[in-house]
Amino acid sequence: MFAVIKAGGKQYKVDQNSVIKVEKIEGELGSKIQLNQVLMMGEYSKPSFIGTPLVKGAVVTAEITNQLRDNKIIVFKKKRRKNYRRKAGHRQELTELKILDITKQ
């Protein structure tokens, strides 16, 4: 069974036992969370349930396996001949989730 979930403003296609990295979710390592924003779910051999915009009663249960930070990206702005330069860095905080169960009630 698979599902398309929305987490942190992005969409992810997940299967059972898959591991994904999403934007930071507060929680302890090893704790279980429920993701209620399921946009689509189904099995590969059967028709899928497509939400309008969400599938009612669908829940994805996941476990927080790691809290980490992504690689640094550099933002550099410059205006030629004006001696204007700005450099900034950013490291996004991420949460690694292991998908345990996909259910529809």
Swiss-Prot record:
PROSITE patterns: RIBOSOMAL_L21
Listed GO biological process terms: translation
Any one GO MF annotation of this record: rRNA binding
Pfam families (alphabetical): Ribosomal_L21p
GO cellular component entries: cytoplasm; ribonucleoprotein complex; ribosome
UniProt KW keywords: Ribonucleoprotein, Ribosomal protein, RNA-binding, rRNA-binding
Top-level division of the source organism's lineage: Bacteria
InterPro entries: bL21-like, bL21-like_sf, Ribosomal_bL21, Ribosomal_bL21_CS
Functional note: This protein binds to 23S rRNA in the presence of protein L20.
Listed PANTHER family: 50S RIBOSOMAL PROTEIN L21, LARGE RIBOSOMAL SUBUNIT PROTEIN BL21M
Subunit record text: Part of the 50S ribosomal subunit. Contacts protein L20.
Family: Belongs to the bacterial ribosomal protein bL21 family.
Protein name stated in the entry: Large ribosomal subunit protein bL21
Organism: Rickettsia bellii (strain OSU 85-389)
